[in-house]
Amino acid sequence: MNIGQAPEPDYDSVKIDYVGFVDPYAVEGMVVLKADNGKEFHMRAFSGEVAKHITSFGETEGEPAPSIYRMIEEICEQNELTLVKVKIYDSGDVLRANLYFTGKKDLVLRNQRASDAMALGAYYKIPILVRKKLLKEKLEA
């Protein structure tokens, strides 16, 4: 797939609708990703620290970005690359993601941790795409 190619029909663009924690100690994070059609994907089983970072990226006066995010930003700047989208998919029992960069040349980093990729998507405010089969109708309690 080329970077500028039209979106694949089996992926939907999502927004981060909710960020929280599964446990009272904020060890395990969770997010709810929501598509324009209202379908949701609940993602969990990742570090509570990543959830805290995602929350801080949306704040105007939050904590400074962790050094790893600044390091990736510097690597991109020095190599004239820009992260343009993140695609989340299932691979067996785990979630993985592809990171799409463009610039001097197109680059795709495949099979990365989905939670880290989603955090980068939130940090850079870029499209986050999720495989449609992962999206479900919202359940009312």
Model-derived segments and spans:
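Divalent-cation
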Residues: N2-A141
